[in-house]
Amino acid sequence: MTKQRVDVRNRDRIQDLCDRVLDGASIDKEEALWLFELEEQADITDLMAAANRIRQHFKGNRIHLCSIVNAKAGGCSENCKFCSQSSAYQTQSPKYGFVDAEPLRQASEEAKENQVTAVGLVAAWKGLREGPILDEVCDRIREMAAEGKVRPDASLGLIDSQEVANRLKDAGLECYGHNLESSRRFFPEHCTTHSFDDRLKTIGFLQKAGIKICSGGIIGMGESREDRCDLALELRAIGASVVPVNFLNPIDGTPYENMEALPPMEILKTVACFRFLLPDKEIMVAGGRTINLRDLQSMIFMAGASALMVGNYLTTLNQSVDQDLQMLRDLGLSPDWKPELAEEGSCADSSCGCGVTPKNEEASLPIGSF
């Protein structure tokens, strides 16, 4: 009987927090951490149901889809322990220089055929500075934008000056992916070649240039639940438009190759908690979902996710886009892509979640997860 009364109290508190979020209020760290610490399956399913209500209220039943292109692979100078593209580790990751226009054109065409709104250019290097590489990057962005098939986005590492951010904006870049990866406290545990503040500085340059931010992190690197909570709060503070939630996929040769996977229900709970803290943002489930969630992949939307990375990741495989589209249909959900978006560059429906700015309105612009 005591256990049943506790469950009822938990359900009531979850409902109270949900109602407050639906009314436009924000929950604080103490309240959020209580959600992250829930462990009983009944409580987690109640939490997911509430997060689903929040998703439907703020995002409807349209799901944003995006994909990425590994535009420069391998040989990265940074020592991020989760990454197979770091030169610090011996992995089987491919290595090649920055791609020319043709692979990006093909990726854009495939994305349009699959109702994918944005294609993100991702490069394995420390970052961008003035020079020939920046010139080439800007050329690729302009070419993709001119074709008008999808919106070009990018995740190109750290930026060392306001001038670089301004040039990306002038080339036509609307969104930039730059994950915080983890909480400030945990960051040095997985990367020591640059700092948490280096990432915040980059985000500041981009925002000053008028570029929208896609920023999230990786769950399952050995961080605590409080670290996950702190990451979500930091993302709320910086005003990220889209929040990709990745789940560690341990790669042979990296320091995390033997990291134990999180239980699927812990992953779904984390997605739900992010929805409570970031109710009106695109919560995007990205890397690691196939290997970590397996048969429970479709439950991410019932846990509050409103966006999905489709197609293969940087160095690992995903399930097919056809399977993802069928998953959406089975759930009564639909992609937010519309044919006229790529042609006209505007959207008449500010509530559709497509991320394209309606006339006289500002919208959050989704981007891929990097």
Predicted regions mapped to residue ranges:
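Core AdoMet radical
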Residues: 88-202, 212-219, 241-246
